[in-house]
Amino acid sequence: MSQHFPCYSAVFPLLLRERNGKREVLLHRRHNTGYMDGKWDIAGSGHVDEGETARQALARECSEELGICVRPEDAEFAHVCHRLGKEGDRTYYDLYFFVHAYEGTPAIMEPDKCDGLNWFALDALPEDMIDFRRLHLHQVLNGEVYDELF
């Protein structure tokens, strides 16, 4: 008989803007987290906590990590990746959402976990971005709604 395993969920708010004729995405650089430190990642991402929906988690994470207010109804589902854990890593459902509106100016609110915050043109993403986040971002922008990594 197969054994059920714990499966975690994480949310990824896609904050996009137009600047100088280029579309940009907001990324943060991970620091002192124990996971992919020094790599650029989707800004405001985080775990879904017990008892909250994915959109509620996204609003909470944006407030905690970026200091901005996102209403859950301003987050539009875009993509999910079922990411199977390897060698003891956790299995995740990564949920990506377009954020259509927010209040405030994004800032680093958790300097113990993040040491960089910047807008990057979609055609000039940093080389040291987490590889599979780059892949997912391109999939989202191409209208792909589901992926699996194993």
Where are these regions (language model features)?
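Short, well-ordered beta-strand micro-motif
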Residues: 15-17, 29, 96-100, 118-121
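Conserved N-terminal beta-strand and adjoining loop/helix that marks the start
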Residues: 1-26, 98
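NUDIX/MutT-family hydrolases
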Residues: 107-140
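Acidic/histidine-enriched, glycine/proline-rich intrinsically disordered or flexible terminal extensions
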Residues: 144-150
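Active-site-adjacent beta-strand/loop module that shapes the phosphate/pyrophosphate-binding cleft
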Residues: 8-9, 79-106, 140
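Short connector loops at helix/strand junctions that flank enzyme active sites
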Residues: 8, 37-43, 72, 90-94
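Conserved Nudix-box catalytic region and its N-terminal flanking loop in Nudix hydrolases
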Residues: 22-64
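A short coil-to-beta-strand element that immediately follows conserved catalytic motifs
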Residues: 69-79
